[in-house]
């Protein structure tokens, strides 16, 4: 029986659901694990290899994992603050919708999303790039990855009720070391 971490990110083509179909074919002992297409990391986090070489062509994805590995305390603080803001905004929005069910009510998470998306496209020092990547991954419409002709991420807000920043754990950070 394998004991495993869950993947942190939604990723198109992720293998989390397929793992039961092939895990019996994975050797239990090996010297080093190689993962050239890390993506959401479902297999990597499931196996929790002691020695691994991982990569991906998506620079922002790799930056997320590098910052998770190297700057976990700062990432954790920034994610906790975004989580707090998101929950506060959602509570306010749901209260407004309950009070005015037939009215259009502002969801401040939408403005928060577009502010973070702007930072994703034009990084500032306000947030780690990995934090903006995680936030976009969890709050964009259907978790889509799409860029316009200028190379800017342009997926709209997904209107999710929850942001689970607790998916990012110290155990994930330590495994990446």
Tell me what each language-model feature is.
Residues 50-177:
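Class I S-adenosyl-L-methionine-dependent methyltransferase module
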Residues 1-37, 42-43, 47:
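S-adenosyl-L-methionine
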């Amino acid at each position: 029986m394998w004991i495993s971490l869950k993947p942190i990110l939604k990723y198109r083509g992720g293998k989390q659901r397929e793992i039961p179909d092939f895990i019996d074919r994975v050797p239990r002992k090996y010297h080093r694990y190689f993962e050239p297409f890390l993506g959401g990391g479902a297999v990597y986090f499931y196996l929790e290899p002691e020695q691994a070489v991982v990569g991906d062509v998506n620079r922002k994805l790799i930056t997320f994992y590098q910052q998770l590995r190297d700057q976990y305390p700062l990432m954790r603080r920034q994610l906790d603050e975004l989580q707090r803001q998101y929950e506060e905004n959602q509570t306010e929005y749901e209260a407004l919708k309950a009070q005015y069910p037939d009215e259009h009510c502002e969801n401040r998470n939408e403005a928060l999303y577009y502010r973070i998306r702007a930072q994703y496209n034009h990084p500032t020092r306000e947030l780690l790039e990995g934090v903006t990547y995680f936030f976009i991954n969890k709050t964009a419409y259907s978790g889509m990855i799409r860029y316009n002709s200028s190379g800017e991420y342009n997926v709209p807000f997904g209107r999710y009720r929850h942001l689970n920043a607790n998916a990012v754990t110290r155990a994930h950070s330590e495994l990446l070391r």
